[in-house]
């Protein structure tokens, strides 16, 4: 049986990347909260 998680770097970045977070109001809220919390990595594209 094929496993359900087949990682793709491009899809990961397109869905959870910085630009996609900035594109929506809720995404910007996510970044704001992660900045407030002091996260070292805001999004997956900060690797």
From Swiss-Prot:
GO (cellular component) term, any one: ribonucleoprotein complex
Pfam families: Ribosomal_L34
Record's signal peptide: none
Biased composition (Basic residues): 1-19
Example of a GO biological process term: translation
Stored PANTHER family: LARGE RIBOSOMAL SUBUNIT PROTEIN BL34M (PTHR14503:SF4), MITOCHONDRIAL RIBOSOMAL PROTEIN 34 FAMILY MEMBER (PTHR14503)
UniProt family annotation: Belongs to the bacterial ribosomal protein bL34 family.
Protein name: Large ribosomal subunit protein bL34
Gene (name only): rpmH
């Amino acid at each position: 049986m094929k496993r359900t998680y087949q990682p793709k770097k491009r899809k990961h970045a397109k869905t959870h990347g910085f630009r996609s977070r900035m594109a929506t109001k809720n995404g910007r809220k996510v970044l704001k909260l992660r900045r407030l919390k002091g996260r070292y990595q805001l999004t997956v594209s900060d690797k």
